[in-house]
Amino acid sequence: MFYCSKCNAPLQIDHSLQDANTGQLNLLTQNKQSVSAAAPKLNSVDFIPKERLELLEEVEKNGHNEPIHFLDTIEEHGTDSSPDHDSSPDASLVVNGGEIEEPVPVSAPSPESSEADGPNPISGRIHTLEKIFDILSNKGEVNHPMCDECAELLIENYKLKFDQNQREKDSYMTFLKKLKLKDDSDIKESDLDTKLRDSIQECRDLAASEQEKLQELRSLEQNREELSKELQDVKMELALQQSTELSNALRLKNELHWTLQRKADQLAQEKARYRVVLNRLDHLRNLNMYTKFFDIAADDQFGKINGFRLGYKVPWSEVNCALGQVVLLAVFLCKRLDVRLQSYKLVPMGSRSQIVKLSSDHDKSKTVLNLYSSNELSLGKLFNFNKLDVSMIALLDVLSQIEATVLALDSEIELPYTISPKKDVIGGKSIRVTSNSDWTFSCKFLLVNFKWILTYASSRH
């Protein structure tokens, strides 16, 4: 059983190979070396063996001008050989295009052939077919055997390559025609000679200029050496004078220079201190204490106040700290904007802050709403909602009252996210903790609105 070298599909060998006799298969396998050895030679005479040439000379001398017919010693499958031809199994002679091939002797059966005709002919034939496929694979770039589908794909690939090469050849031919049709005046020999002479003259001028510059450089080098020598003499003379009559004057000069340098350094230090103080003063003047105390930021996921995040899947310790900062910010804004809260009192106590909900004037009862949680659920009137839901709704109501005060002070201000305390919604998202991901967005919207009000309060003061 043979398999395709490309897709590994089982193959059915063609009947031309299945029905081939031992002599035909031996001819295919034995001619491999002779063909490969003769390929690199260029002389056609070298391709003909010496015995064939001698046979040709002998035939020409004997005057045999009759055509030589091909004697087929290979049996066809399902047909008998013709009685008109010599059926000798010893040799065959072929005349093709004026080239005479020597009789091909039928060699003694090899071990493989005898094994094929013997008790196990299938294994010998398979071994011979493997040799034939190896010869075909070594001669080309494609491995054999190959199924019909892979062969058709290979042929299509070669056709595409041929078409591509044909188009490339046409492009080159078109470009060559354009070059031939180009105006000959652009490439006249006289113009080339003129440009060549100009280039040679320019090269000579550059060489002459180079020599002039080199001469000038040598002159400058000589002057430099002379000046260096003079400088050395002056230095020696100056050293001699310093060692005698100018030593005291130079010492006094150095002392005065040192004193001046020290005073200049002190002046530079004082100027630097003055600039630092001025910069610090300008920084303090431009410092916004509101945003410094309450740093509110928001990214794609969470809102933050002073580095503490608010939202779903945030640790409760961090959420409690953030809510405490929000309560402190609300108290600060109420004092700055003179907001009088209705029915609420804010109690900032860090991560355990509270909102006290006051009843009507006649009833002095109050309800303490803890603005912190440990994720413990309470069963009762709130339909298993978290205790923090009521506190968050109260905080949203406080923000709504602060917004109303700001709008009363300046009607042109509009917060980015709409507040609906009756529906427990800000910016279209529920403020309830149990809303999970919506609570994250609503907390971020809450902080953004607080940041806008804080900016407005800082601009008023």
UniProtKB/Swiss-Prot annotation:
Positions with biased composition (Basic and acidic residues): 75-88
Keyword Coiled coil assigned: yes
Keyword Coiled coil listed: yes
Biased composition (Low complexity): 103-113
A single cellular component GO annotation: phosphatidylinositol 3-kinase complex, class III, type II
Annotated region (Disordered), positions in chain: 75-94, 101-124
Alphabetized UniProt keyword annotations: Coiled coil
Gene Ontology biological-process entries: autophagosome assembly; cellular response to nitrogen starvation; late endosome to vacuole transport; mitophagy
Top-level taxon of origin: Eukaryota
Coiled-coil segments on the chain, per record: 194-286
Gene Ontology MF annotations: phosphatidylinositol 3-kinase binding; protein-macromolecule adaptor activity
Functional note: Required for cytoplasm to vacuole transport (Cvt) and autophagy. Also involved in endosome-to-Golgi retrograde transport.
Family under the similarity heading: Belongs to the beclin family.
Protein name: Autophagy-related protein 6
Gene expressing this chain: ATG6
